[in-house]
Amino acid sequence: MLSVIIPTDGVERTAVATLAALVPGAAAGVIREVLLVDRSNSDVMERVADVAGCRFLRFEGTRAAALAAGARQARSPWLMFLHPGAVLDAGWIEESTQFIQMVAASGKDRAGIFRYARAPYTDPGLRDGLKFVARMITGPSTEQGLLIAR
């Protein structure tokens, strides 16, 4: 159902956290494949991809071009782009599946972005409110996950 594309830039720690969060989706059959697109000259990410059972794509160029290259290599009709270090909330599998079914039923092209989660230890207040308003004005961030049909 989904191909997940993660631009890693050679940073192992953040990519591993994201991969660990995707395990339930793979076990549920929602994730068909994960592509790690790496723009570094390090072999670390290739080893991580091998151990995690991911596809690995080395790419030279901009981050946008790397994401496009990952999309071209993906095999699934739906693409999920995740920033390395993104850890999806527990309900992401159900929400993604419902979104895909809704889009298929409507026949209209749509894309979805993942909401930011509130850190459990933060004090909600004016600062969070200002951040929310800023996000509404500027639109989605590149750090938010994107779910889109081919």
Enumerate the predicted regions with their spans:
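Short, well-formed alpha-helical segments that are part of the catalytic scaffolds
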Residues: 10-26
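Glycine-rich, basic loop-to-helix element that forms the pyrophosphate-binding segment
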Residues: 45, 59-74
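Short aromatic/hydrophobic "clamp" motif used to bind/position activated sugar donors
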Residues: 79
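The conserved acidic donor/metal-binding loop of glycosyltransferases
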Residues: 83-87, 91
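Conserved donor NDP-sugar-binding/catalytic core segment of glycosyltransferases
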Residues: 91-123
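A recurrent flexible, glycine/aromatic-enriched loop bordering the glycosyltransferase active site
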Residues: 110-121, 131-148
